């Protein structure tokens, strides 16, 4: 029977704990909430929104920087278009924009003149890439030289250069 008394005592302890919880609940309901504490919650939320906004702005700036860096790379397709347009304009009577312009320049193969213009950075052709108008000088010099060397190798194999 001593065991049953322990069980009854144990159950009665649990009941008193529940009664204490109910009393705490009533005190919370009847207490007045200080309006300043609610303002703190709103302020922290607005701060969180401002932090998120600044974070999004930082990400946007990072993406813009990547686009600018990507824009500076020239593709083989783009350099072929610049060469073709420059060739077309030279055939129509545009004077070559090379540093040492002479009668010898006019006698040279047009492909040599075009490559010389591009290497000197005086090629007048402008292309649009990612919403920006770019000349040959705006592109990465190493990539430009790599593509020009590749195109010249092909022309030499075809005996055009």
Swiss-Prot record:
Keyword Ubl conjugation carried by entry: no
Any one biological process term the GO annotation gives: DNA-templated transcription
Induction: Expressed in the early phase of the viral replicative cycle. Expression seems to continue throughout virus infection.
Key words, A-Z: DNA-directed RNA polymerase, Early protein, Nucleotidyltransferase, Transcription, Transferase, Virion
Record EC number: 2.7.7.6
GO molecular function terms noted in the UniProt entry: DNA binding; DNA-directed RNA polymerase activity
Summary of the function given for this chain in its UniProt record: Part of the DNA-dependent RNA polymerase which catalyzes the transcription of viral DNA into RNA using the four ribonucleoside triphosphates as substrates. Responsible for the transcription of early, intermediate and late genes. DNA-dependent RNA polymerase associates with the early transcription factor (ETF), itself composed of OPG118 and OPG133, thereby allowing the early genes transcription. Late transcription, and probably also intermediate transcription, require newly synthesized RNA polymerase.
Quaternary organization: The DNA-dependent RNA polymerase used for intermediate and late genes expression consists of eight subunits Rpo30/OPG66, Rpo7/OPG90, Rpo22/OPG103, Rpo147/OPG105, Rpo18/OPG119, Rpo19/OPG131, Rpo132/OPG151 and Rpo35/OPG156. The same holoenzyme, with the addition of the transcription-specificity factor OPG109, is used for early gene expression.
Annotated protein name in UniProt: DNA-directed RNA polymerase 19 kDa subunit
Organism: Monkeypox virus
Gene name per UniProt: OPG131
